[in-house]
From Swiss-Prot:
Belongs to the OXA1/ALB3/YidC family. Type 1 subfamily. GO terms for biological process: protein insertion into membrane; protein transport. This is Membrane protein insertase YidC. It is found in: Cell inner membrane. Coiled coil: none annotated. The lineage of its organism: Bacteria, Pseudomonadati, Thermodesulfobacteriota, Desulfovibrionia, Desulfovibrionales. Residues 32-64 are annotated as: Disordered. It comes from Nitratidesulfovibrio vulgaris (strain DSM 19637 / Miyazaki F). The chain crosses the membrane at residues 7-27, 347-367, 418-438, 498-518. Its main location: membrane. Required for the insertion and/or proper folding and/or complex formation of integral membrane proteins into the membrane. Involved in integration of membrane proteins that insert both dependently and independently of the Sec translocase complex, as well as at least some lipoproteins. Aids folding of multispanning membrane proteins. GO terms for molecular function: membrane insertase activity. InterPro entries: Membr_insert_YidC, Membr_insert_YidC_N, YidC/ALB3/OXA1/COX18, YidC/Oxa/ALB_C, YidC_ALB_C, YidC_periplasmic_sf.
Length: 539
């Protein structure tokens, strides 16, 4: 009975995983926007912001007379680094393009670089400043006297945009660095006349970051509240708007692999507003009232991230931005697995081979447990004649039959569930690797065998995507059948039927799984078959 329950538990664990993915795709949880007839006020537009208190970096000392402001004609400003190419508009520093040099939209030759900004999101400003709830890039006049930036390794540069918005002189200083995707902003505010109090907000926005993500990758709004990661994926929820208050570290729009985030330096009294509208995902981190003394100046700062969810770089970012890489409940397993994959990849240069090496290591770790389990199955095989007699003798009295069976197991020191232990132990590793493959930017477009042998057909060129020809899941199912042939058949007819259908169920489940995960399970099956064969020969 215990063995039967354990096997059913294993099957249910995998069914839950697939069922969740199915529901996410078919019940409107996929982050795809529904069309809207008209464009209304977006949630990040601050007309609904409640007044809040906030500490400011104020400099009340008198300063020189404000120079005459001369608006300039709008033009494009370009920032080029080894990591990206950014194009901004001088009218308020609106971001028009942010192309990632090292990441392509597809694995095909000539595919364009991933652009974190699209035309629709440019209208709503993916790198904007809200003043009194209004978009400063639309309501003010701006000037820019600088030039383009071209940054080499280790270099940084500053673009300064000056404007007059709602009676306030606004100076936006954006600092770009060649070695990170972090953009740092300092906003200097000075009243044109008397002391002023304004409400300030930092906004980021983008289009769909996962156009080809399918049911496993959705664009969503996420945030870190009091050190705890939260997100909303449902398109219907995002269209209604998201409002969060409290100890917020950052707000973001993200997919499995890419991140657009705003992280105010001073998070006191910050409110997050998020919304999906007209195909644009937008987040605003809005502050409370900012006091600007007459003749003085107030400085407020914010950091932005436009780029991949690169663990190494995000670890160096402020406001715990590294928590944007959320690996779920199995993160304690997934993170070491990613580290091991990186270690192997550093030496072999192929993530498919790295997964195979990782599988071998995991198999060696679990070898003693597997060995004990297979011995238990062999003992169960020897007990089958006695178990069959008990069934015939107590067939009408299941309670008595189970009692006699347990006495028999105890006499021969056999654990009826022992044969299931290797699979049960591997389930956390399976889910950990599943999360790692879905969320590790290192594995996006990572190849194993790029073409089918002796053909030009692209095959396992992206281990984070499914096998396009379903070869690996079918072979994996065949190895499960072979493994069953080497395993003693369960005495319970119901249990035997469940085991018979397991390879079929697993094969269909794995058809849409990332091919890297299928390679792991296939390799694990082959090693298990080799171990069983070795034990049978030894016996």
């Amino acid at each position: 009975m215990e063995s039967k329950r354990a096997i059913i538990a294993i099957a249910l664990s995998f069914v839950v995983l697939v069922g969740w993915s199915y529901l996410a795709d078919h019940m409107g949880w996929n982050g795809q926007p529904a069309p809207q007839a008209q464009q209304e006020e977006t949630a990040p537009s601050a007309s609904q912001a409640a007044p809040q208190s906030a500490s400011q970096a104020a400099a009340p000392a008198p300063r020189a007379e404000t120079p005459v402001f001369l608006p300039s004609a709008g033009r494009e400003v370009t920032v080029v680094t080894p990591l990206y190419k950014a194009v901004l508009h001088s009218g308020g520093g609106v971001l028009k393009h942010f192309s990632l040099t090292r990441y392509r939209t597809a694995i095909t030759a000539g595919a364009p670089a991933v652009d974190m900004v699209d035309t629709a999101s440019t209208v709503m400003s993916p790198l904007g400043l809200l003043i009194n709830g209004q978009p400063s890039w639309n309501t003010g006049q701006w000037s820019f006297d600088g030039g383009d930036l071209s940054l080499g390794a280790g270099q940084s540069g500053v673009l300064t945009f000056t404007g007059e918005v709602d009676g306030v002189r606004v100076v936006r200083e954006l600092t770009f660095s060649a070695d990170t995707y972090l953009i740092s902003e300092k906003v200097r505010l000075a009243p044109l006349a008397d002391a002023r109090t304004v409400r300030l907000g930092f906004t980021v926005g983008t289009g769909n970051l996962s156009p080809n993500g399918g049911q496993y990758d959705h664009t969503r709004v996420a945030w870190l509240h009091d050190g705890s990661f939260s997100e909303k994926t449902s398109a219907s929820d995002l269209e209604k708007g998201v409002l969060e208050t409290g100890a917020l570290s950052w707000g973001a729009v993200m997919s499995n692999y890419f991140l657009v985030a705003a992280a105010p330096v001073d998070t006191t009294g910050v409110t997050l507003k998020g919304k999906l509208q007209e195909g644009v995902y937008r987040v605003a981190m809005e502050r409370g009232d900012v006091s600007i003394p007459a003749g003085g100046e107030t400085t407020v700062a914010c950091n932005y991230w436009f780029g991949p969810k690169d663990r190494g770089l995000l670890k160096e970012a402020p406001n715990q931005l590294a928590e944007a890489i959320n690996l779920g409940w199995f993160s304690i397993i997934a993170r070491p697995l990613v580290d091991m994959l990186e270690f192997f990849h550093k030496y072999v240069g192929n993530y498919g081979v790295a997964i195979i090496l990782l599988t071998v290591v995991i198999k060696l770790v679990f070898w003693p447990l597997s060995h004990k389990s297979y011995k238990s199955m062999e003992q169960m095989k020897k007990l089958q004649p006695m178990l069959q007699k008990l069934r015939e003798k107590h067939g009408d009295d299941r309670e008595k039959m189970n009692e006699e069976m347990m006495r028999l197991y105890k006499t021969y020191k056999v654990n009826p569930a022992g044969g299931c232990l290797p699979m049960l132990v591997q389930i956390p590793v399976f889910f950990g690797l599943y999360q790692a493959l879905l969320n590790a930017i290192e594995l996006r477009h990572a190849s194993f065998i790029t073409h089918l042998p002796f053909t030009d057909m692209v095959w396992l060129a992206d281990l984070s995507a499914k096998d396009p020809y379903y070869i690996t899941p079918i072979v994996m199912g065949a190895t499960m059948l072979l493994q069953q042939k080497l395993t003693p058949a369960p005495g319970d007819p119901t249990q035997a039927k469940i085991m018979m259908f397991m390879p079929v169920v697993f094969t269909f489940m794995f058809l849409s799984f990332p091919s890297g995960l299928v390679v792991y399970w296939l390799c694990n099956n082959v090693l298990s078959i080799a171990q069983q064969w070795w034990m049978l020969r030894k016996a």
